[in-house]
From Swiss-Prot:
Annotated function: With CysN forms the ATP sulfurylase (ATPS) that catalyzes the adenylation of sulfate producing adenosine 5'-phosphosulfate (APS) and diphosphate, the first enzymatic step in sulfur assimilation pathway. APS synthesis involves the formation of a high-energy phosphoric-sulfuric acid anhydride bond driven by GTP hydrolysis by CysN coupled to ATP hydrolysis by CysD.
The protein's name: Sulfate adenylyltransferase subunit 2
Quaternary context: Heterodimer composed of CysD, the smaller subunit, and CysN.
Organism: Rhizobium etli (strain CIAT 652)
Gene that encodes the chain: cysD
EC number: 2.7.7.4
């Protein structure tokens, strides 16, 4: 069995660094407490790993929570087949570097029927290749708790979600049927077939995430930093045009400019922003004056009014 206690300083999440400021330290302590609570309370936890910045922070916190042992639960990546190529390369490198138990799941029905965001639209594609696929993977693994990287500052439906978010046997979420959470006491009692989504980053903000990444020197997918990239403008978004599967529509032309991504997902459904931020400090400075949510760059959040809450009620991340 591989040694679970890496002897390189960079592999050790507890390596000596400058002390965290009190705000970030309090957030870190809360997140580590949630990880340990879930691991102690539930029989088969799993961590949902989407490869983005929040997942990278979540993984770092999980490694801290259980160091020097291995992360004691698998990571689940629900792959749609349309992720940025840089994301998949980063995922594989990370799993190997930290000796992670990584599960990849692709909806076999969606793959067989060639469900794509171009042929079926963002709503149907997301329902089949993400929500349905996630339910399949959780059922197959018989997982009773799933860690996620959602934060309350991201979007309205997430703002009212508890740290322990209870799901029915078919993974549905009813926001009216959630339990009170007093201080740091969480009630994890569930009936057979029910499950919990646990969110250790609930009380973090986007700027907190980036400041923590800077303080802890956490690696990220390079797409978060600005560089000259090719893109097309479509439906009010700048879509990366570096994948051969992206076909230009009538009137579209490939452009090139300094762009980056505030959020990562499926490349046809994720819009970039114009930016000159090539370093962590520049990204943080840019965010401190931002006036719109990072999820403005997600096509799936624009499907209809209340679309994210509808997706979450049906079992979405």
């Amino acid at each position: 069995m591989p040694d679970s206690r890496p002897d390189t300083e960079l592999s050790n999440p507890q390596s000596a660094k400058a002390p965290l400021d009190p705000h970030l330290k309090a957030l870190e302590n809360e997140s580590i407490h949630i990880f340990r609570e879930v691991a102690a309370e539930f029989e088969r936890p799993v961590m949902l790993y989407s490869i983005g910045k929040d997942s990278s922070v979540l993984l770092h916190l999980a490694r801290k929570a259980f160091y020097p042992g291995r992360v004691p639960f698998p990571l689940l990546h629900v792959n749609t087949g349309w992720k940025f190529r840089e994301m998949i390369a980063f995922r594989d490198e990370t799993a190997k570097k930290y000796d992670l138990d990584l599960i990849e799941h692709i909806n076999p029905r969606g793959a067989a029927e060639n469900i794509t965001p171009f042929t079926h639209g963002s709503a149907a594609f997301t329902d089949i290749m993400k929500t349905e696929s996630l339910r399949q993977a959780l059922d197959a693994g018989q997982f009773d708790a799933a860690f996620g990287g959602a934060r309350r500052d991201e979007e309205a439906s997430r703002a009212k979600e508890r740290i322990y978010s209870f799901r029915t046997p078919d993974h549905r979420w009813d926001p009216r049927n959630q339990r009170p959470e007093l201080w740091n006491v969480y009630n994890g009692m569930i009936r057979k077939g029910e499950s919990v989504r646990a969110f250790p980053l609930s009380n973090w903000t986007e700027v907190d995430i980036w400041r923590y990444i800077q303080a802890e020197d956490i690696p990220l997918v390079p797409l978060y930093y600005a560089k000259m990239r090719k893109f097309v403008e479509r439906d009010g978004m700048m879509i990366l045009a570096e994948d051969p599967r992206l076909e230009l529509l009538p009137g579209e032309v490939r452009q090139e400019g300094m762009i980056r991504f505030r959020t990562l997902g499926d490349f046809p459904l994720t819009g970039a922003i114009r930016s000159q931020a090539t370093t962590l400090q520049e990204v943080i400075a840019e965010l401190e004056i931002a006036t719109v949510s990072e999820r403005q760059g997600r096509a799936i959040d624009r499907d209809q009014s209340g679309s994210m809450e509808k997706k979450k009620r049906e079992g979405y991340f």
